[in-house]
Regions:
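Sec-dependent N-terminal signal peptides
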Residues: 9-19
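Positively charged n-region of N-terminal signal peptides that target proteins for export
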Residues: 1-9, 112-114
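Sec/Tat signal peptide C-region and signal peptidase I cleavage site
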Residues: 18-26
């Protein structure tokens, strides 16, 4: 019975934290946003003259049992001179809670000047939330442990805008545009555990993302970038990054994340193969406050450029 109670407490903590996260940054986090910007803003699909497939796998708290694990696969690119198309599927798992979804996007781009282009995008799809209750209770009347998994599926949408030039871009996106209401706890759970609300809301976020590529010479370039994330009631989070590329073959960079009172840093490395494949890796360095609990974060990216 002691084991069951410990598992029960563990699940309860995850659920309460999960519901609490509905008031904070709710969406999967990635470090290599500059290499997978479509996962942030669907409007960038109109910025490229080719189709790209990106796959990202992230283990956010390595060494911590049942820490966040994220997988994202995206395909996007220019369909014709004005239209960009794209699609994404993803999975985000933390302990007994999971979030998965899929979406497709349509982007329309048009020139502002000879060198500057504006793109507008609408992305639509679904999101499924799940709490796994795979425990057996000794007492049949246990209101939380009895019954099956909790599953809730909701429609989702994102609006994006992107302004781009030859070597720069800046854009904004509003994910979770519909602000759908989410119910993961039944009435018995809410009553017995005295939760203040059994409902959560998928709050609309505001993302602003930009980058500029500067060629130092014919072999070396640098790319500073930033990624701002904002949601009502939560302090704005800002990521600053810079990467340097040599002969368009290998690159390295750093990313600095400012999040409330807790900041963090990540090191990034990558390799481009024949202008068709690119590999990326980032290591999130744990802060002095968290190093006793986990050994950092690992994120891998594989990109494939398709011939148009």
């Amino acid at each position: 019975m002691k084991i069951i109670n410990m598992k029960k407490i563990s699940i309860l903590i995850f659920v309460i934290c999960f519901m609490g996260a509905l008031k904070a940054q709710q969406l999967p986090q990635i470090t290599q946003y500059m290499n997978n910007n479509y996962a942030i803003n669907p409007a960038v699909a109109g910025m490229y003259d080719y189709y790209q497939i990106n796959s990202t796998i992230r283990n956010q708290w390595a060494g911590l049992n049942e820490g966040p694990r994220t997988s994202i696969i995206s395909i996007y690119g220019k369909h014709n001179s004005n239209v960009g198309l794209g699609g994404t599927v993803y999975s985000d798992v933390t302990g007994p809670t999971s979030r998965m979804g899929g979406s497709a996007s349509y982007t329309y781009a048009f020139p502002i000047t000879q060198k500057i282009k504006l793109a507008l995008a609408l992305q639509a799809g679904f999101t499924q939330f799940k709490i796994i209750k795979n425990l057996r209770a000794e007492y049949e009347n246990d209101p939380f442990l009895k019954g099956g998994d909790v599953v809730e599926a909701l429609p989702d949408a994102t609006f994006g805008v992107n302004l781009s030039g030859n070597n720069w871009y800046i854009g904004a996106a509003i994910p979770q545009l519909l602000s759908s209401e989410l119910k993961l706890m039944d009435d018995d759970f809410a009553r017995i555990y005295d939760t203040t609300s059994q409902n959560g809301k998928l709050a609309s976020h505001i993302y602003i993302l930009g980058a500029y590529t500067y060629d130092i010479n014919s072999q070396i370039s640098i790319e500073p970038s930033f990624f701002l994330k904002s949601v009502a009631g939560v302090k704005t989070q800002i990521d600053f990054g810079i990467k340097s590329e040599y002969k368009k073959l290998i690159w390295a960079g750093i990313n600095y994340k400012m999040n409330n009172e807790l900041s963090s840093m990540a090191a990034l490395f990558g390799y481009n193969i024949n202008d068709r494949f690119n590999l990326g890796y980032s290591y999130g360095i744990p802060s002095s406050m968290t190093s006793n609990y986990y050994s950092g974060s690992h994120e891998f990216l594989l990109g494939v450029r398709l011939p148009h």
